[in-house]
Amino acid sequence: MNEVYVIAGGEWLRNNLNAIAAFMGTWTWDSIEKIALTLSVLAVAVMWVQRHNVMDLLGWVAVFVLISLLVNVRTSVQIIDNSDLVKVHRVDNVPVGLAMPLSLTTRIGHAMVASYEMIFTQPDSVTYSKTGMLFGANLIVKSTDFLSRNPEIINLFQDYVQNCVLGDIYLNHKYTLEDLMASADPYTLIFSRPSPLRGVYDNNNNFITCKDASVTLKDRLNLDTKTGGKTWHYYVQQIFGGRPDPDLLFRQLVSDSYSYFYGSSQSASQIMRQNVTMNALKEGITSNAARNGDTASLVSLATTSSMEKQRLAHVSIGHVTMRNLPMVQTILTGIAIGIFPLLILAAVFNKLTLSVLKGYVFALMWLQTWPLLYAILNSAMTFYAKQNGAPVVLSELSQIQLKYSNLASTAGYLSAMIPPLSWMMVKGLGAGFSSVYSHFASSSISPTASAAGSVVDGNYSYGNMQTENVNGFSWSTNSTTSFGQMMYQTGSGATATQTRDGNMVMDASGAMSRLPVGINATRQIAAAQQEMAREASNRAESALHGFSSSIASAWNTLSQFGSNRGSSDSVTGGADSTMSAQDSMMASRMRSAVESYAKAHNISNEQATRELASRSTNASLGLYGDAYAKGHLGISVLGNGGGVGLQAGAKASIDGSDLDSHEASSGSRASHDARHDIDARATQDFKEASDYFTSRKVSESGSHTDNNADSRVDQLSAALNSAKQSYDQYTTNMTRSHEYAEMASRTESMSGQMSEDLSQQFAQYVMKNAPQDVEAILTNTSSPEIAERRRAMAWSFVQEQVQPGVDNTWRESRRDIGKGMESVPSGGGSQDIIADHQGHQAIIEQRTQDSNIRNDVKHQVDNMVTEYRGNIGDTQNSIRGEENIVKGQYSELQNHHKTEALTQNNKYNEEKLAQERIPGADSPKELLEKAKSYQHKE
């Protein structure tokens, strides 16, 4: 178990060690450590490349082993807090690299402090390791300021001192003021022989004699300054509020402190009662001097108080330093514990290991020298205070406070030197003492030089003080010179002053009434410059319901200019199938040729069609080409301009047809034909009709056109629009908004203002109209009825004397409005607009006729369509007549074909049977039977 000794903050240091122990056991620390080791390996590799020194590698290995031991080996630590020895602070799994230096340095520091205080034995109240820096001396200073915290004792004690104690001194001469000031037990002195005649008033305003009051005060003081009393409890909680046994500590340490410094054997209760009595006497004497107006006593007391405040203000710096530096030592120790992981990461690099570890150990040693220096300083100061002690009496009370103020200020000032002095002790003792001496010398020379300079310059400042709002010995050396002015008061109460240079200065404040109501007339001219930055957030909800109808009249004139240009690419594919009125005639011609050829050769129509088609061209190929060029030159009629256009194109098509037929048949036919004169005619008719009738076309074409055109168009348009619109609107609007705005603005303005105060005129108006109530109306501000009457008269005054002037100014300004503005010309009437429109329309009609623009194209097209439709109808009727003839011939040929087909079928069957008949038998089956019978016979 490793012990760590600290001055204070043991629980906080335990939390620091727990945090470090927990952090260095996590994966995060492992990752950080591996990264640091990797970087150190890279550093060693770089050094090896530069120097090829084996000692660099061995040094890195040694550092790696050392760091592993410091981090991976864990131990337990017990923190011993000197400010709270009851609690036990134990921390496990602390790295040995942190636990060993911390434990070693703190144990050495604690042992040195304990050894020093054991050799120079002092009570616990003045021992640094037990109660802190100058605790006993501070306890004595606080005890001299003990005041009763019981309100009943405070009021009664002050009256008792003023009426009873001072009366015994100055009237009855029972004891002198010097006896009271030098008495070591003023409590017994002031209550020894109280007057039975003089008295005081208690809290119930009952008169009690000094004798009776002394009994009451003694009983209350004894109870108030013992354990459980109000004053006892207040100061115990103020000094030892956080301790579990504050009453016991207060009783023991106060007695020890007074015993050490003054050799007193009184108990803490007696000491408190004595000091409360002294401070009550001091307050009572001061209050009596203030009541009697004793200026000399006030100045004396003020001087003493001023010196005490000056000393206490000086010592406050030392007190702050004495209280804060031990806590700073604890906090720095905690910081040294907290940065241990960072130091380990830095120590991984073998070039930094020794310097980092050395600096860490030196820092811990530096912090542990603080308590030793504190103990030495505390011992020296308490020894000095004991040797230069003064008795605690009323006359020495201020001197005691002064002495301990000096003691505390010196100790605090020296304690501020402990951190640099302790570091110099570690580094070099002689230089440290030299630095401290130089600081002390400069601090003493500076105020001395300042005081000497004030004396040489003659700048003195003494006795600038205030005591209980009483000013004394006021002396002013200011010089005021005033001459050459003449001032007189006018009949209205104002003042007029004529200065030395002849100017007149008027002051009308004495002639003005200050009334509960103010009436002003103001004319202002202002020029403002404003800069504003605003940031706002707005949220709104609205609902709107409305109805509207409107009537309006408008006349429009339009002028327009346009310009266009462009280019285009196109690809076209199509398939055409056409049939005209001539197709039906050619079809009839082909059918007639087929039938004639079939009859001539005594063959079927199908065979005739094939033979006629085979006599024509069986395959055909056609190629078509077309190319054209077109140009255009145009000049506009109504304006200036022209255009040139060029278009080129090419088209190619391929038409093809293929006819192929296959036929298989078996039959026997006997025919004889001697007619061949119609074959050529039938073949020619079939060929011509076939060529005319069959026409199919598939075409694909592509074209690209680029055009550039410049054109100018002048357009004249006349339009007449007449509209009437009436509009009525009714709107219901509901808006709900939430806004948050932040605005920063800067405004710079300059204004000129003329203001006239009409309060006095209103006062005269009230005197004239209500002379019997003028005072109440002009001065009574508490009555609502009077206020209402005053408001009515003020409004009447404004209407009678102020409003007419405002209205006259408004009328004059209104007449001047619009004088510098030009009149707005009125437009022409509707007849002028219609006449203008008719004139423009006549110009357009004339230019249209000059351009030979026809307007009967639709009628001409309709006539042509009607004519063409009639011709097509006649052709259709002719085709239908021929179609009926063809259908008749077709029916006849069909019947003949059926007859011939039946005859041919019969002949086919007979011929087939004849071919299948076998000699010697009528059928194969019969022939087989005969063969079997012959076989059996054999």
From Swiss-Prot:
TraG* probably arises from the post-translational cleavage of TraG. It is a multi-pass membrane protein. GO terms for cellular component: plasma membrane. This is Protein TraG. Residues 923-938 have a biased composition (Basic and acidic residues). Residues 1-53, 351-412 are cytoplasmic. The chain crosses the membrane at residues 54-73, 330-350, 413-433. Plays a crucial role in donor-recipient cell interactions. Required for two stages of the conjugation process: pilus biosynthesis and mating aggregate stabilization. May interact with TraN. Keywords: Cell inner membrane, Cell membrane, Conjugation, Membrane, Plasmid, Transmembrane, Transmembrane helix. The gene is traG. It is found in: Cell inner membrane. InterPro entries: TraG_N_Proteobacteria. Residues 654-677, 915-938 are annotated as: Disordered. It comes from Escherichia coli (strain K12). Residues 74-329, 434-938 are periplasmic.
